[in-house]
Amino acid sequence: MNQRPIQTATLSWNEQGTPVSEQFGDIYFSNEDGLEETHHVFLKGNGFPARFASHPQQSCIFAETGFGTGLNFLTLWRDFALFRQQSPNATLRRLHYISFEKYPLHVADLASAHARWPELASFAEQLRAQWPLPLAGCHRILLADGAITLDLWFGDVNTLLPTLDDSLNNQVDAWFLDGFAPAKNPDMWNEQLFNAMARMTRPGGTFSTFTAAGFVRRGLQQAGFNVTKVKGFGQKREMLTGTLPQQIHAPTAPWYHRPAATRCDDIAIIGGGIVSALTALALQRRGAVVTLYCADAQPAQGASGNRQGALYPLLNGKNDALETFFTSAFTFARRQYDQLLEQGIAFDHQWCGVSQLAFDDKSRGKIEKMLHTQWPVEFAEAMSREQLSELAGLDCAHDGIHYPAGGWLCPSDLTHALMMLAQQHGMTCHYQHELQRLKRIDNQWQLTFGQSQAAKHHATVILATGHRLPEWEQTHHLPLSAVRGQVSHIPTTPVLSQLQQVLCYDGYLTPVNPANQHHCIGASYQRGDIATDFRLTEQQENRERLLRCLPQVSWPQQVDVSDNQARCGVRCAIRDHLPMVGAVPDYAATLAQYQDLSRRIQHGGESEVNDIAVAPVWPELFMVGGLGSRGLCSAPLVAEILAAQMFGEPLPLDAKTLAALNPNRFWIRKLLKGRPVQTRSPATQESSR
């Protein structure tokens, strides 16, 4: 997925005060009454709001071509909120709205357009507060305490549609086929769009559109829709509505299939870190019943227990799955952390910005590659030594890249607060429960703990045990590594207290935390080492790295590690630096089932390829891990992905990126190339018990 910045909308305003697209030379909504037009064409055209009451599932999925000012979305949201007030016991509880927009508006233009509809003001204000930067790809926005999920896909709809993954097949309940008039925007209205709509629509799903153009009607009919002409809005004589009578076959990549959970009313999460807490909350937003088991006496005793952690995206300039994921993850994380703060969830933090320094030739080359993309300056920007030093408050000694929305937060504070929030929402926690064995018995998972503790049984299990993930029989073959990291806690000084931003070099240094008057500097990186004892050599090395990377300036000499204050944790790392999230793959079954996968794809007929079975997984067993040293950035999005997968919902990333997060990816890549999968013993197989 191309995450490069995209062109924003250029607007003018006509005599009626209606916004006009300069790109398409067309108005965004009717000069007569845009709100009434939306109600007539898109809501009533699809049978809403009347359909809310009879909807048989807890979630209703809408898709739209052309988000524009968001008028359709805001009107639907308002009507749904009214429905929920009037029918609190109805089956339907959540809306999922997927919209494609080639030229997103600036937030100031949104505000000007929204001013015309004071009745939508409260909803529009919430939308604008979460409005994403103009980066191509999916921006998942959670509104109304999770009752509304908005997936904004920025980019050309016909470029985006082929990149979508299987989770959108046969899912959409209603389409708002909007966008500018076919005569003004002919590239959008084509066979590819109509066929994709049919593929994504569930049987009985509907569409409506303002146009009655003959080629649109014929294209939708050929794609499989039953199409009807009805009265248009205002002076427009006709418009089109329709229904998909039967499911349309959709091609899939079965080797990367992501199964939903059969039961979400009895989920056990194993783990006590930040991703465990975020996953619990993401599941609870959807109505899941969650029980958490943690080996320690309290949460955040592992890698999530540090005092300060830097939050910034991982870029590489390759426009690949890694850059796509971390761009989306970073922006999603900031939105979610800000929402938590607005809810009164307290944790030490400063959104002070992060500066990544070009301290040697290798790091300079990496940063130059990152900056080949002309990122929005609100996301990332090249800066000189002088510019970085002015922002940081101390001489940075080097040029670099600046992330203005980055900063630091206290992982320990945040994890504790999230656990408390999940408990307030009904999660049961069992601390000092160290999982010893996991066994499938009678369609349930039996969890065996210490000798004095009774075994527990749950329908569905999520493993989120960090570097201990490969300890279980079911996860033994996953290529995960344990990496020890010691972070030094250093007292501030009058000079160090001037540091205003997180500095990243061959290590990192945080600004002073006002809560304890200390900075954090780190961290060591000892692969395969799971000990958490204090080590003087690593304490001194943390300081030496700063001195080596900034030899031109004197202020790093102020860093004093002599009081030996530090904390050590063990990360769970993967060689491609991407997390693993999804169902736990069955290693032996995968190798047996896909031993001739490459031949079947390359030389088999169409029927043989279509007969390839979905990837084998352990039933009702899921995992999230391998977050490495970027957990603060990646944890919110991987938690959301896992919860959405388990509930069978559309996922907020393209197919290529989701494949790169699949726990079976290393095996499948080799099998697709016809290469043998080597059985190996990852470093994490040494037990910490």
Curated annotation (Swiss-Prot):
Q: Which GO terms describe its molecular function?
A: flavin adenine dinucleotide binding; oxidoreductase activity, acting on the CH-NH group of donors; tRNA (5-methylaminomethyl-2-thiouridylate)(34)-methyltransferase activity
Q: Which Pfam families match?
A: DAO, Methyltransf_30
> According to its UniProt record, where is this protein mainly located?
cytoplasm
Statement: the UniProt record of this protein carries the keyword Transferase? yes
The protein's superkingdom reads Bacteria
Name the cofactor(s) required for activity, per the record.
FAD
Q: Where is this region: FAD-dependent cmnm(5)s(2)U34 oxidoreductase?
A: 270-689
The enzyme's E.C. designation: 2.1.1.61, 1.5.-.-
Q: Which UniProt keywords apply?
A: Cytoplasm, FAD, Flavoprotein, Methyltransferase, Multifunctional enzyme, Oxidoreductase, S-adenosyl-L-methionine, Transferase, tRNA processing
Q: Does the keyword tRNA processing apply?
A: yes
Which family is this protein grouped under?
A: In the N-terminal section; belongs to the methyltransferase superfamily. tRNA (mnm(5)s(2)U34)-methyltransferase family. In the C-terminal section; belongs to the DAO family.
Give the protein's recorded name: tRNA 5-methylaminomethyl-2-thiouridine biosynthesis bifunctional protein MnmC
What gene makes this protein? mnmC
